[in-house]
């Protein structure tokens, strides 16, 4: 049997197309967070589950290429996080990086992502420096930052009469950034900071720090910490009777923290959050899916992991490539409307601007179910929550 040249040409083209499709490398997403330490309940395995939910919901492929997820436990060590980020980019071919909890690790990874020109989506870390003097054209600080936390909770408590403050601060980048931002808000609204004490990350005994705070005779104890540190400091403040003379201000609290502390101890606390599992029908439906897999309601960081992943994949699809600069250009064009935020946009300094919420922890009598823990008492428009972009000091925003 003879084959004419057109048949041979078509056969050759089909063979080449099949070979190309077979050889197309996967799109690789990297995720580095605390998987086993003090912040693991905030992000950790639940963050992995949320990202995998997004990959599944997107169809498992983008640009005809399979989507793969690389994960790593940074153990809250900045040098380990930076080294693994470099390895993910240089050896494993990661196309982007999602930074989980711990600002010191995010600050260490940010210049690595910039050097490799890969999108760096910061979800769990909150230090405003990330989009300040250290900003890069590849950063997308997605969920929150210390400025927004301070402007929400700090102002609300000063407005309600909490004029004198003492800070119990986690002794690393995030805690110091949160304390600094909160102190500025307190003083700008007519309050006064009487002092601060620094506790190492993952402390178990806060008694000496709490007694120092009580001795200051401040009206408010500002907790510039998070995760297990926030839980332990609030529980111990209640046990030692600190709450009889001082009002607690949890500057970063998660739904899992309140669940762990319990409403009898946490009731009445104000907190600022970008998201709550029951804030909308869309958020509720997604959270129920997450709950079926993880058996806890998601934190805002885990919800942010899902949203950031979906947003990145949409940008890749729109750009028609995984090239970092082109994907970032698409991210800067996008308005994000999903179960996590409405009308979110990426500012020139790499900050995702969106609404935040002032919440108050319910009393046991007000709560109707195990995870019915907050009332959202005020929506804070994004520009008000995050403040003027020029104030961050990012050279890209001049």
Question: Which role does the model predict for each range below?
Answer:
Residues 9-18:
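Bacterial N-terminal signal peptides
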Residues 1-2, 18:
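Short terminal targeting/anchoring segments and short Lys/Arg-rich nucleic-acid-contact patches
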Residues 2-10, 23-398:
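Extracytosolic ligand-binding ectodomains
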